């Protein structure tokens, strides 16, 4: 029984590492000037789909400045954009991917708000759709954006 419990814990932990992509900030551009505190800014981040080698996504997000920023207390606005592209051969079979899976998640407030990106498979059109949404536990946000990646042959 104990070994079954440990196996379940290992499976859950390894599943989390397979699902969640890590984003790297490329650059941030200030959008306001605050004399005595950090500026509001828009940051561009990049991540690769962990289950679809050959796809890279860039997401831009507004980030709130002020004194709450260094402490992580600010709630970032639900303003974002996403662009995903095929940058290499895509050899994974679309039928092996789930119809809809979360591939990226980033907290945008200390408590209840998160930006999530889902991969949605459109098998009839051989396309992968990436849907970015902002969530809140109490009132969900209608903010969303999509990017599509048609699977194209890649020259070798």
Feature names for model-found ranges:
Residues 1-4:
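Positively charged n-region of N-terminal signal peptides that target proteins for export
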Residues 54-121:
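Mature extracytoplasmic domains of secretory-pathway proteins
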Residues 18-23:
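Sec/Tat signal peptide C-region and signal peptidase I cleavage site
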């Amino acid at each position: 029984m104990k070994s079954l419990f440990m196996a379940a814990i290992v499976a859950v932990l390894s599943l989390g590492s397979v699902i969640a992509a890590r984003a790297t900030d490329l650059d941030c551009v200030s959008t306001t000037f605050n004399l005595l505190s950090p500026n509001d800014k828009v940051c561009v981040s990049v991540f690769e789909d962990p289950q679809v080698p050959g796809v890279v996504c860039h997401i831009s997000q507004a980030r709130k400045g002020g004194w709450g920023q260094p402490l992580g207390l600010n709630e970032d606005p639900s303003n974002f954009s996403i662009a995903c592209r095929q940058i290499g051969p895509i050899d994974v079979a679309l039928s092996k991917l789930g119809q809809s899976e979360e591939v990226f998640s980033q907290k945008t407030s200390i408590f209840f708000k998160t930006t999530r990106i889902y991969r949605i498979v459109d098998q009839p059109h051989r396309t992968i759709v990436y849907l970015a949404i902002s969530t809140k536990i109490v009132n969900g946000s209608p903010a969303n954006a999509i990017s599509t990646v048609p699977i194209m042959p890649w020259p070798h």
